Amino acid sequence: MSSHYEAPIRKPLVVGSKSYHDVTVDVARPVEGRANKQWWTVFSIALAAFLWGLGCMIYTVTTGIGTWGLNKTVGWAWDITNFVWWVGIGHAGTLISAVLLLFRQKWRMAINRSAEAMTIFSVMQAGLFPIIHMGRPWLGYWVLPIPNQFGSLWVNFNSPLLWDVFAISTYLSVSLVFWWTGLLPDFAMLRDRAVTPFTKRVYSTLSFGWSGRAKDWQRFEEVSLVLAGLATPLVLSVHTIVSFDFATSVIPGWHTTILPPYFVAGAIFSGFAMVNTLLIIMRKVSNLEDYITVQHIELMNIVIMITGSIVGCAYITELFVAWYSGVEYEQYAFLNRATGPYWWSYWLMMTCNVISPQVMWSKKIRTNIMASFIISIVVNVGMWFERFVIIVTSLHRDYLPSSWTMFQPTFVDAGIYIGTIGFFFVLFLLYSRSFPVIAQAEVKTILKSSGDNYKAEREQHGHNHSDNH
């Protein structure tokens, strides 16, 4: 992680003439200072949405699943759509933290902390949906293989839904440990700057006695690499297992082998879009434009563009395989998606996920903050509709025409979904006021190689050296 030479053509990752002390002050300011008006506005809206969603959840649990728009044919709808959408959003955090760490990508330094927090908070939202969907959430622990005295009660290890339980719990625990490990030097920094004894005690407990000695740093880097190695397979395996919820069934439109890679690409695609959405808001609210630069936004836009193209290829491959299979029911399932009663959701998905990311080929657009923000939201709207199309359009047309039906969401469906978005932002905003949103210790390691003033000095030194010769 030591500083090394960087080509002058590379744009700086820290702009403004920043010293090590400036980095500490800038990162600690949102935690130590008072919340501004923008923070309170966003927090109030998020809290109102969360409370509405909480009311809808309580109503569902006390009344029953009949409060949703489910019917005799469409037994899975918005609940599983939202579950898959939230799990997918979490993938970018692990990819930025683990995969880009192993590839030694310096641009991850400023964005990894918030991306990891986003992973944890989105997995928490995802976990709510299967629990509510049980109908009797107080029996939720029955999905865990806990030895019991209930007679023949035991989990079915052949069920993809049980695989989900293991995948999500492993993902959440590894992400939490990874995130916390990265936070240790930053908690220690806040502990040393704390003014009140209570704050000092809290951050002292959270920092696990971090002293900043060489031995601490050595162990920190070793643990980071080990956790990155553990988390990298999780990026691929978690959404693969989520796709098995569909791929291991026999329903036309679900029973296809392309789903695992297609889901993983879609997860990274939607995750990076959400990271972009959050960081563009946060760099403004927390005054962190010098650390989350246009260069960071551009690099994430390039990832969105590439994964969007992969998702587009997956859509076309899916259509080709349905045609090539010669199975009439498979062909009908895909034809019905594009031309049936839900045609609008299919074409909305295609427009948002395949066409909109292609505008990123233009450097002018991918370096424009407002355009990036709009496209990142459009992409996540498209990815929600992708899950809706996969789930609802495959179910609403059965082998028996007498079972054909339409799905109509109720206010409870919408309320729970909006409530989880509100809950996510409540958690994220509270995190941004309690924890450092940028890994200041890691940003300092690239300051001399990628800092604005250091690069300028080195370039000037290079010119002087060549003039002397």
Model-found features: residue ranges?
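Central hydrophobic cores of alpha-helical transmembrane segments
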Residues: 371-381
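Extramembrane terminal tails and long inter-domain/linker segments of multi-pass membrane proteins
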Residues: 1-38, 141-157, 186-222, 294-295, ...
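C-terminal TM-helix exit segments that contain a strictly Trp-centered aromatic cap at the helix terminus
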Residues: 53-60, 127-137, 314-321, 382-393
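Extended C-terminal subregions enriched in glycine
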Residues: 344-369
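Hydrophobic alpha-helical transmembrane segments
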Residues: 87-95, 348-357, 423-424
